[in-house]
């Protein structure tokens, strides 16, 4: 069969990897590189060039079984990373990093702050009582309402939980307050974030994340068209017509592996179900800068973490998410030059130290979007179209792989139905 795949993020690449074994595929990619959020930059510096990741960075073997199985199949090596989280608040001067008592109290006056001790108490209570909400499968309360209902303190909310969750999902404070609380707790539970100790080890791809993307696409690289955005998609009873700058091309089936909002915009003939499901899952744009300006890190070196959340205004967490990833810590670069990746806080970065500037889009999670995720099967198959992407679950690499495997399963089932 002739099959089109739109997008070379993790979902599109996994779908194409498997489809290429038995079908004639054409992969359309709007960017000038393969990978989507898998984005590695080769930076010349002291000690030789460094492959610095700016999108997908870390994974673990406990909660990424499909992705790590794929890495093993491809022979891609991983290296141990150091995962830690810290907060810097310009309004209050607060700085801490949560990996040890020394770093938790990197700012020694935190020992005398009742609000800081209250935050620690709330962290322990939140972790201890999470099971109650997890056991209530029908509870759709938002995170903001849940925190208010349970009486958590402002320090815990604005200096710990919302910054951590906002950093995980690249979402601003207002969006995080609308996040389904049980959905967040399920993710935290799965990733060991409700425990102070015994959390899973995290890893990065040795040589940068592009190494796995290159291995995954090696067999079908000649079928990938870079800088070729799809302009429109029209479905007919016996074929799918994909329009790009090259004109109209006809295929027997289509795998749509771009974002949900992009997918819906491409369809000339969306069904009511496609409108309802894809339209319920929105995205937020984030500006991302790769740079060497270490002034974005906490002022105290003891408080430097792998993930550093920057609170510039404590008034309901005003402004977009602002987090700096220290890539020396995450990717193990042994050099004096600090390589950082910062979301959104571009005005604070010395422009002379900027290496690259990107925009990535991330899913927005609400009770409505989570409900729509449960309807993936309703739109996978009709009109010869199959949807995959990390947005069908939590938005991470494992989710992209699982969504592609789900779409492939629907595809195989549809072929069996047509043959009967």
Segments the model singles out, each with a brief description of its role:
Residues 99, 316-420:
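Conserved flavin/dinucleotide-binding core of flavoenzymes
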Residues 228-361:
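Mid-domain catalytic core of redox enzymes
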Residues 20-44:
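Glycine-rich FAD pyrophosphate-binding loop
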Residues 2-27:
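N-terminal Rossmann-like FAD-binding beta1-loop-alpha1 element of flavoenzymes
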Residues 41-67:
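N-terminal glycine-rich dinucleotide-binding loop that anchors FAD/FMN and/or NAD(P) in oxidoreductases
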Residues 11, 33, 261:
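Conserved Rossmann-like nucleotide-cofactor binding loop
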Residues 61-181:
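Mobile amphipathic helical/loop "lid" adjacent to a hydrophobic cofactor/ligand pocket
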Residues 184-244, 249:
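Helical element adjacent to the flavin cofactor pocket in flavoenzyme catalytic cores
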């Amino acid at each position: 069969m002739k099959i089109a795949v739109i997008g070379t993020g993790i979902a599109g690449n996994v779908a194409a990897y498997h489809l290429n074994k038995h079908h004639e595929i054409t992969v359309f990619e709007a960017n000038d590189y393969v990978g989507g959020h898998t984005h590695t930059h080769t930076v010349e510096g002291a000690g030789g060039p460094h492959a610095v990741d700016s999108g997908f960075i870390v994974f673990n073997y406990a909660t990424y079984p499909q992705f790590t199985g794929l890495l093993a199949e491809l022979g891609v090596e991983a290296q141990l990373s150091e995962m830690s989280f810290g907060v810097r608040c310009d309004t209050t001067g607060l700085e801490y990093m949560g990996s040890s008592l020394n770093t938790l109290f990197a700012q020694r006056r935190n020992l005398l702050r009742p609000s800081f001790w209250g935050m620690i108490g709330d962290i322990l209570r939140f972790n201890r009582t999470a099971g109650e909400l997890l056991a209530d499968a029908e509870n759709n309360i938002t995170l903001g309402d849940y925190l208010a209902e349970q009486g958590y303190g402002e320090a815990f909310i604005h200096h710990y939980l919302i910054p951590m969750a906002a950093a995980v999902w690249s979402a601003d404070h207002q969006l995080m307050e609308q996040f389904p609380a049980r959905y967040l707790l399920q993710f935290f539970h799965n990733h060991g974030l409700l425990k102070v100790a015994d959390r899973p080890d995290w890893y990065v791809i040795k040589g940068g994340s592009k190494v796995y993307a290159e291995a995954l696409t090696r067999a079908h690289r000649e079928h990938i068209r870079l800088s070729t955005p799809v302009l429109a998609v029209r479905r007919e009873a016996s074929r799918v017509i994909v329009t790009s700058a090259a004109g109209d091309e006809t295929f027997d089936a289509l795998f749509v592996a771009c974002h949900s909002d992009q997918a819906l915009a491409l369809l000339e003939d969306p069904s009511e179900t496609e409108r309802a499901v894809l339209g319920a899952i929105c995205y937020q744009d984030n500006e991302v800068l790769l740079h060497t300006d270490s002034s974005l890190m906490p002022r105290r070196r003891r408080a430097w973490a792998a993930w550093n959340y920057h609170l510039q205004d404590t008034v309901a967490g005003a402004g977009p998410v602002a987090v700096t990833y220290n890539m020396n810590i995450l990717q193990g670069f042994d050099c004096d030059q600090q390589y950082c990746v910062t979301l959104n806080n571009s005005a604070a970065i010395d422009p002379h130290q900027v290496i690259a500037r990107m925009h990535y889009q991330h899913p927005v999670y609400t009770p409505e979007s989570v409900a729509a995720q449960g309807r993936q099967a309703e739109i996978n198959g009709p009109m010869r179209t199959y949807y995959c992407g990390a947005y069908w679950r939590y938005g991470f690499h494992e989710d992209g792989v699982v969504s592609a495997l789900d779409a492939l399963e629907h595809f195989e089932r549809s072929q069996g139905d047509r043959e009967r």
